[in-house]
Each structure stands twice: as C-alpha cells, then as structure tokens.
C-alpha cells in the first residue's frame, strides 16, 4: 500500500457532495414549483381569474398521504437549498470563512429543524 493510498483512506469523508445534491435539487424544485404556486395563490385565485378551491377541498388534498409526502419533499429541499446558499454567502460573500463550522452547523441545523417542524405539522394535520 502506498502512503498516498493510506492517507486517502484515513481521511474522513466529507458530506459536501450530499449537501450540494440537496442544494441543486432544492433549487430546481423551487424554481419549477414556487412560481406556479405564487401565480395561483397570489394572483389567480385572489383576483378571480380562476375559481378558488374551498377550504375543505384544500384540506382534503393536504391530508392525502401522497400530497403530504410531496409537500414535505418540497419543503425539505427548499430549506436545504436556502441553508446552503446562505452558508456560502456568509462564507465567501462576507468573508466569514474562519467561522465556517459554526455557520454550517447553524444553517444546516435550522434546515433540519424546519424540516422536522414541517414533517410534524404534516403528520398531525
């Protein structure tokens, strides 16, 4: 075994590729879904362009297990996308790289907390 091989095996694996995956998936999902939801619930329904669904219908939709799963995935990916973006804004934009561990822990911790809260809210609905 060469020294470089043993060094490579002894190093800890980074979670960075997984975090970049969540970032890109969250950005893609948010870019595709958020504008449609904003158009529908922010303009089309309030301005009367489309007939607004009643509260009972929306509640029945959200109580469907498949809809709950889709909403949870959307929220989790959007939160991790925002956490990753905010982390790198603080790290590179504001030059706070010396606090990277604290910033990463806080950003991703808030994303996990928000994801858990969303999951709990969807489960108890």
Swiss-Prot record:
It is found in: Cell membrane. Signal peptide: none annotated. GO terms for biological process: fumarate metabolic process. The keyword Transmembrane helix applies. It holds the Pfam family Fumarate_red_D. The keyword Transmembrane applies. Its main location: membrane. GO terms for cellular component: fumarate reductase complex; plasma membrane. GO terms for molecular function: succinate dehydrogenase activity. The chain crosses the membrane at residues 29-49, 64-84, 102-122. Keywords: Cell membrane, Membrane, Transmembrane, Transmembrane helix. It is a multi-pass membrane protein. Anchors the catalytic components of the fumarate reductase complex to the cell membrane, binds quinones. Part of an enzyme complex containing four subunits: a flavoprotein (FrdA), an iron-sulfur protein (FrdB), and two hydrophobic anchor proteins (FrdC and FrdD). Belongs to the FrdD family. This is Fumarate reductase subunit D. It comes from Mycobacterium tuberculosis (strain ATCC 25177 / H37Ra).
